[in-house]
Regions:
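Short, isolated positions within intrinsically disordered regulatory regions of eukaryotic proteins
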Residues: 11, 25, 35, 82-85, ...
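Short helix-capping and hinge/turn segments at secondary-structure transitions, especially at repeat
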Residues: 8, 38-42, 106
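ATP/Mg2+ or Mg2+-diphosphate-binding catalytic cores
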Residues: 80-114
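Active-site acidic catalytic loop and adjacent metal/ATP-binding pocket
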Residues: 1-31
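ATP-dependent phospho-/nucleotidyl transfer catalytic cores
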Residues: 66-69
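An alpha-helical support segment within catalytic cores of ATP-dependent transferases
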Residues: 10-13, 52, 61, 103
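Active-site activation/catalytic loop segments of kinase-like enzymes and analogous catalytic loops
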Residues: 30-59, 72-90
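Secondary-structure boundary/capping motif
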Residues: 40, 71, 99-103
Length: 114
């Protein structure tokens, strides 16, 4: 979850670390990259650069599909979460759920084509 509260600057090496105690325990690290991509509205070129930096080499087809799958999982989770919030938060949350679901469907198409 790339909220600003989840970034930590190391005093030792001036590197930024993304932490998220909600999901970090037993989750795939690619989940966090997928979430950064989604929340940052990354382009395919941004995604490739992010994955290349993380993996240390250009992602192969399986690595890219794994990343796309995680983008789908992220939007699925937040679509369901938003739908549960509609009775309490109203139309803005419904709109957010619809936006997430539309992107999920777009990424399903990209996954099938990859």
């Amino acid at each position: 979850d790339p909220l600003c509260e989840n970034w930590v600057l190391s005093a030792d090496d001036d590197r930024l670390y993304l932490i998220d105690w909600e999901y970090a325990g037993m989750n795939d690290g690619i989940w966090d990259l997928a979430d950064v991509s989604i929340e940052g509205v990354f382009t395919p070129e941004n995604d490739e650069l992010l994955l290349t930096e993380y993996l240390g080499s250009k992602p192969d087809q399986n690595e890219y599909k794994h990343f796309l799958a995680n983008k789908i999982y992220v939007d699925y989770l937040w679509t369901l979460w938003a739908k549960t919030r509609v009775p309490y938060d109203g139309q803005p949350m419904e709109d957010w759920a619809v936006e997430r679901y539309a992107r999920l469907k777009d990424n399903l198409r990209l996954f099938a084509e990859a």
